[in-house]
Amino acid sequence: MTMLEVNGLGKAFTIHHLNKTILAVDEIQFSVHAGEFLGIIGKSGSGKSTILKSIYRTYLSDAGQIIYDSKQFGKIDLIQASEREIIFLRKNEIGYVSQFLNVMPRTTCRELVQNALLEMGETKETARIETEKALSYFEMDEGLWDSYPNTFSGGEKLRLNIAMATVKKPRLLLLDEPTASLDQQSKRKVREMIEKLKQQGTTLVGIFHDIEFMEGLCDKVFDMKSNEMSVVLEGVPHES
């Protein structure tokens, strides 16, 4: 079953004070089956993050379709979907992890993870138990659980970001350089979590500059330079 299909995706940005338009991505095309992991590779500035943000609808694309096979709405074009539909999907089906933590002020680490579960309809007790499991798993110091994240280091913020997204066990998870500022032990934890989510059926699309991290994880690779997708067989990409 195809979980995500991107057809002819295009996105440009206008720099108004220079009266200039920059094309970020053009005619992007790929598909991901349920439970697969697609890795997107390419040099900095090639538009990798733009693709993920377009899928999550942080950016509204200028052209093409992004067809997602949702549990709630069936097949839906994320470009044409209403704001209400997008908010529902973000809360219940689609997760996003970036290098940066952007959260509500005066909300503790514990509350942020619990709220991610509560908005899905989980009970307070279930949210409490699963939150503590997630924070422990990603080795967040227990002394930080009731602290505000603006005091955290970059690595701590990133681990919290990952915990918030993965605790929900989303149907589709978008990963934008989620291991950028992590040490090797934390990277292993993230890899183990990704493998666990895959086993549970989560579909993933991710960007990693750490090629070694991606090895053995990805089922497919999309190359921004060639604008082509390949299937990974025994660690080596082959054209699909």
What are these regions, as identified by a protein language model?
Residues 41-43:
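The feature captures the beta-strand-to-loop junction immediately N-terminal to the Walker
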Residues 56:
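Helix-to-loop junction immediately C-terminal to a conserved catalytic motif
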Residues 65-88:
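ABC ATPase NBD Q-loop/coupling interface
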Residues 107-118:
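Q-loop/switch helix immediately C-terminal to the Walker
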Residues 125-143:
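Conserved ABC ATPase "signature" region
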Residues 148-152, 156:
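Conserved ABC ATPase signature
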Residues 165-166:
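ABC ATPase C-loop
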Residues 173-176:
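Catalytic Walker B motif of ABC-type/P-loop ATPase nucleotide-binding domains
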